Every structure is written in C-alpha cells, then in structure tokens.
UniProtKB/Swiss-Prot annotation:
Homodimer. It is found in: Cytoplasm. The keyword Cell cycle does not apply. This is Glycine--tRNA ligase. Belongs to the class-II aminoacyl-tRNA synthetase family. The gene is glyQS. It holds the Pfam family tRNA-synt_2b. One of its GO terms (molecular function) is transferase activity. GO terms for cellular component: cytoplasm. Catalyzes the attachment of glycine to tRNA(Gly). It catalyses: tRNA(Gly) + glycine + ATP = glycyl-tRNA(Gly) + AMP + diphosphate.
Amino acid sequence: MKDEKTMDKIVSLAKNRGFVFAGSEIYGGLANSWDYGPLGVELKNNVKKLWWKKFVQDNTYNVGLDCAILMNSEVWVASGHLGGFSDPLMDCKECKSRFRADKIVEDYLTEQGAEVASADGWSNEKLENFIKDKHIKCPKCGKENFTSIRKFNLMFKTFQGVTEDASSEIYLRPETAQGIFVNFKNVQRSSRKKVPFGIGQIGKAFRNEITPGNFTFRTREFEQMELEFFCKPGTDLEWFKYWKDYCWSFLLDLGINKENLRFRDHSAEELVFYSKATSDIEYKFPFGWGELWGVADRTDYDLKKHMDHSGEDMNYLDPSTNEKYVPYVIEPSLGADRVALAFLIDAYDEEELEGGDQRIVLHFHPQIAPIKAAVLPLSKKLSEKALDVYSKISSKFNIEYDETGSIGKRYRRQDEIGTPYCITVDFDTLEDEAVTIRDRDSMSQVRVKIEELEKYLEEKIK
C-alpha cells in the first residue's frame, strides 16, 4: 500500500534532488525565500515556455510584453493598490503573534471539513464575529484573545535616486497586470491589433504577505504568468468561458490528474466590486484545495481608472462600426511557482515493485520534465562511446550524462527526478551501433539504432 503523499516528502525530495533550496541557507535562511536548483529552474522554465507557446505564440489573438518591475507610483494610486491593497490583521494579545483574520477563518473551515473554505470578500465585522462566535483560538498559543482587525498594506516600498523622501518613493509591483493596462494603447497601436486581442506577460511580483507558507505555494516574491484579454462589452462572458476552458485544457494536456482539479466560482459576496465574474481553478494540494489559476471578468474598471487618473484616452475605435468604447478585460492569472509545485506534487509517486522493493518516481509529462533523457554507460570502459551518443542528441534535448554507480541505482535516481528515458550504452553498442532505451513509467526496454535515436526521442517528447 502506498504511503500518503505529504508536503514533508515533497520538500525533502525537492531539496535532496536539487529542485528547490531554502534561500540564503548558509546564513540561516530568510523566511519564505526559496531558490530554484538545477532541476527546479528547468521545471519552471519548461512550464513558462509552454504557457508562452500556448497563450501567446499559438494563439492568433495575443501578443507579448515585458514591463518594468519599478513603475511610476501614480500607477498604483490609480489602480487602488496604494489605498486598498491590504490584508486584515489580528494580533493575539497573549503571545503577541500576528495573523491574517481571513486565513484563521479559512483554516478553521478546512478543519471542519467545509467543501469551500474561503473567506474572500468578508468584511472585517463578519470576520471578527465569526472568530468570536466559533471561539477560534490562537494557532500558536491556543488562547482566545485577539485584537480588533486592522489593515496592512502589502506593497514593498523603496526609494529611487540618492534621496529618501516622499518624492522618491517607489514600489515593487504587486502584480504584472498594471504594466499591461498602462501599455494598452501602445501595444494596440504598434501591433495593429483589433479588439478582441490579448497581451501576455511573465514576470516577478512582490507582496509583503503576513502569513506566507506551504513551501512555494505562497511567497513574498513570486512569478506570474498573466494574460489581459480585451474584448467588446457584451461579449465578455462568452470570452470568460473561452479562457476558463483554455486554461483547464493547458493543465490536462500536461498531465495533471483531473481528479485533483476543480473550478470554484466566486460567490457574489466574494467578488471584488468591479468584477462581473471570477472563477478559480483549484488544485488538491496535500494541505487542501488551493487556488492555482484565477480567471476574472474585470469589466472596464482598470482602463477607466487609468484613463481618469492619467488623462490619457483609453477608448478603442472599432474600424468596422466606428463605435468607440473602453474594452472589457478577461484576466487569466497563473503563478509560475504555484503551478510548478502542483506539477511536482501531482507527478510524485511511491511504487511497490516485485520482490518487495520500492521506488520513488516523478511521472512528469515529457514536455515539462527537467531532464528529457539520461545517457548511462554500462561500464566506465564505454565512456568514450557514451559521450559520443550524448553529443549527438544534447543540442536538441536537455540530456544528462551519468557514469557513477551501478546501473540499477542510476535508473532509480533518474526515476526520482522524473527523467522519461534512460539510454544505456552497453558492450553490444560497439558492435551493433544501437542503445537500450528504458521507459520511466513502464520500465520496459527497447533497442534503438543510434542513427535513429534523435527521431525516436522527438516522437516521444512532444
């Protein structure tokens, strides 16, 4: 019987095999800071490349953009982030620990087995009353003695230039979306795009989260993959459904187990005031269901706010009808770190083998696997031939070469990092110019001519 898949096992594997390390580890680390190791950076880069291909390159509606992290502070005034981008905080009067009130409520709902454990959109009064009525205790000391809720702004502030005063204050962006909105007219004009069209962007964002956690699920520094899709008012709900289905298929096509995914539509109470509809694709993490991908109908709120604040006209003139309007926006927003974690968790498996043996294997889809194949000489005496095989395919695929240890242990290591194929160079290779290819999932083996190796891998890794 398989053991339960736990976050402790995932974190241990991630560190030991070079997916993710604690940030600044030799100095005691930095809370909730993570560095991607050799395999982790390949995994995340593969996910980003595949997102870009599906959402920008392969979709005729969309183009790409890469905006600056540091922006004029007026952007954040107009967007409402400076005035309203905050978390509801409560302090425990006994142990002085600080918590997000909505997270205390959500954790309680999860413990009680609620199907939907969300407190999004709850007022401060509702949060406080719920905590009091349910006698929810401090997660740290177990006492029931909280302060009233107060708001805490999530933006990281710094200064630009040589002086540190109000005139030089700037902020690390808390989302990539606003850079797209302020460039709406630039992109539309220069690319000659007609509505409907979208602008995609991948980039870092920063939020001074009070209660980050669950490994790379919620961090203060993270990477977003966002699309802002501009459409004519009245067609927005049709496009909202289109992008929901598009996002869903992206995850399934890359092998995520459908049973671990669900849509959760936001209730009227949860919706931010400008949103017409919001739906999250949630993944069943070991710690519970968590948001993976948010798809929102933001209406014309963002463009109108920037038009009002900047004085720049954000209206679009339809060349077919001569109708002028501010486009509505559908936003599918995905965290690269969060979805990479979901792929890692979903791929993890502990298999019982014949004879009572066990192996850990990551069943990555070949397209997201960090290493596509490993070249393994059966003996160090075959290194020269094995390196020749490696050189024939390493320019086309991300290939690993390993000649250390028994062939069985090398197979197990490749299973554990999710390598789909192991290419064994044996003494027969010197005679027949063929290699043995072992499949990660079935552990079956086939003999393939070296001259046909590249074609074989191309057909398998697509």
